[in-house]
Amino acid sequence: TERQGCPVCNSTKGENSIIKFLQDYNINFVFQMKFDDLKYKSNLYYDFYIPYLNTLIEYDGEFHYFDIFKNGSFETSLIRDELKNKYAISNNIDLIRIPYWDFNNIESILTQKLLSKIKEDN
């Protein structure tokens, strides 16, 4: 299905927290990044891509871990996540996955994983 409206406005609580972190640290990012050669029935999107660091970020809500909707989407979600993991590895792109239970730790996770990469580059 085609995404409607402003993707940032439609983002989740976890995604909003990540957006705030990236903006607070003036880290340029692409929201809802897609690669033309990454598909499963349709295009797959990563939540965030930071070109400068060649890093993707995925915030994984509960539906990535539990069959919440009971409509077959859980199995599809598992397949999509695995394809995204493999794509990142095969293209030498760092992928940071943040599970929903780490919502309160988003800032510390990103500080550790992103800011250390920025320091390495300088």
Which functions belong to the PLM regions below?
Residues 1-122:
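Nucleic-acid endo/exonuclease domains
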